């Protein structure tokens, strides 16, 4: 039998209700979905989620066991295989006894091997991928009888039985099995979105009937529904300026940027690649990115997301001018940076804010008046940019600004005639954050990238509108009470 090695469980995640269901001692589960929706990937992920090291029987009617390992490279880290020769039946039977190549098998002989497994091996888990291919050789009466026999033997053996089916309209198994999930793929704003629907999980309470998931890197991963409380900072004892706290609780950075790059094209290219967006080498150097944020998303979520990007540029010794989103004080902003920092904050970070009351971090703040007009704030921005450029020459300059603070409704033209041209000329990478709906179509035509942070089916998504690209799901984990987000491409 195969055995599994240790691996990070965060890479694989199935919905909590389904996880609770598959942990039961015995059950039958039907996984429905059209071709390419992820049935095989989910089945293999369930094996890993249950930490199955032996005593399983995977029947493949579509692919050879060898091809499974080619299509799912991560299996190589879990399943130990020794001296497997595909053309050597004896080796295949001994080394791959857990994976059965049933592409050429007659239904009768295959059905007999399944029942033998149920009778001879105590409490096995059997995955039939797919049941359609086997059942298609049976007439209706024989199929119903065989399905009942499998269920009976499954109960007697205390086994777990998983079927996959590509015919969502076929309901012959529906009343027999204990659980039914269906995988679907839909187009949303030119991007493919995958969902898993929990139709029936006998004995398990279904709190959420559907989840968005991805098959990125051949791994099934679903995403929990949006919960603002996950983005609260609960550990106030961690000091973001403390070298010890930074080294002990540092998490991975979001973008793998080159440490010695002096060309902003490389930075922007890698941002584009991390979001699966096409990057053009013909466009001008300085870039402007507009990120629209759904108003229902809390300031903590926005800050946690932007902190990932800002921290990466800080780690590459770039100059950063950032403006905290409304509702976030400078101290809290620095707290959100904490999971990603690997060294002490230096003079390369400047925060635009209306208050310098926190004396411990006042050195990072450039103050402006609470009653300042957008023109006065723009003037202050130019002063800060000039100061940073004079103090730290030949360094990349990135800015993150709240667009709403510079959008003067009495002088709508200033945004395009003054601010946008200034950023284009003086700032290597400008991120404009809009909490309110963008009022000017002209603005959209003047940016290089348009991203949208919003909720879809109660899941946090980052969409790429300009240029067209894959959507990304946001998930959060915590490092001693501080939230840290990750971005996963939805494919």
Please describe what each predicted stretch is.
Residues 19, 32-33, 290-295:
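Residues at the beta-strand->loop junction immediately N-terminal to the Walker
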């Amino acid at each position: 039998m195969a055995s599994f090695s240790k691996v990070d469980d965060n890479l694989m995640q199935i919905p909590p209700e389904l996880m609770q269901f598959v942990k039961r001692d015995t059950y039958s589960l039907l996984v429905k979905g059209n071709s390419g929706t992820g049935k095989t990937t989910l089945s293999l992920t369930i094996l890993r989620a249950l930490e199955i090291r032996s005593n399983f029987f995977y029947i493949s009617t579509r692919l050879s066991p060898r091809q499974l390992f080619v299509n799912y490279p991560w299996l190589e880290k879990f399943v130990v295989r020794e001296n497997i020769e595909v053309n050597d039946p004896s080796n295949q039977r001994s080394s791959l006894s857990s994976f059965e190549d049933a592409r050429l098998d007659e239904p009768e002989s295959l059905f007999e091997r399944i029942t033998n497994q149920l009778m001879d091996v105590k409490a096995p888990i059997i995955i039939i991928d797919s049941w359609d291919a086997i059942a298609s050789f049976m007439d209706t009466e024989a199929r119903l009888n065989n399905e009942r026999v499998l269920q009976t033997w499954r109960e007697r053996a205390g086994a777990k039985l998983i079927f996959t089916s590509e015919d969502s309209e076929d309901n012959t198994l529906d009343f027999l099995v204990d659980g039914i999930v269906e995988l679907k793929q839909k187009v949303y704003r030119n991007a493919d979105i995958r969902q898993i629907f929990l139709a029936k999980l006998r004995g398990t309470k279904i709190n959420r009937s559907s989840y968005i998931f991805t098959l990125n890197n051949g791994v099934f991963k679903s995403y929990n529904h949006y919960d603002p409380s996950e983005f609260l900072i609960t550990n106030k004892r961690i000091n973001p300026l403390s070298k010890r706290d930074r080294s002990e609780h540092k998490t991975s950075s979001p973008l793998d940027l080159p440490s010695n790059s002096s060309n902003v094209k490389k930075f922007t290219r890698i941002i584009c690649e991390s979001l699966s967006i096409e990057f053009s080498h013909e466009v001008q150097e300085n870039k402007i990115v507009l990120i629209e944020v759904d108003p229902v998303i809390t300031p903590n979520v926005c800050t946690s997301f932007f902190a990932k990007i800002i921290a990466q540029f800080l780690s590459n010794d770039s100059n950063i001018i950032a403006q905290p989103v409304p509702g976030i004080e400078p101290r809290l902003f620095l707290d959100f940076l904490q999971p990603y920092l690997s060294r002490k904050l230096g003079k390369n970070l400047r925060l635009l804010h209306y208050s310098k009351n926190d004396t411990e971090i006042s050195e990072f703040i450039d103050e402006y008046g609470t009653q300042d007009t957008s023109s006065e704030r723009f003037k202050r921005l130019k002063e800060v940019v000039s100061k940073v450029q004079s103090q730290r020459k030949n360094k990349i300059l990135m800015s993150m600004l709240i667009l709403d603070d510079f959008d003067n409704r009495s002088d709508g033209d200033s945004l395009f005639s003054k601010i946008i041209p200034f950023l284009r000329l003086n700032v290597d990478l400008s991120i404009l954050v809009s909490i309110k709906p963008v009022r000017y179509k002209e603005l959209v035509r003047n940016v290089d990238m348009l991203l949208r942070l919003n909720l879809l089916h109660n899941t946090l998504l980052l969409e790429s509108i300009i240029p067209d690209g894959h959507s990304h799901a946001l998930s959060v984990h915590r490092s001693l009470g501080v939230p840290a987000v990750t971005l996963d491409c939805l494919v």
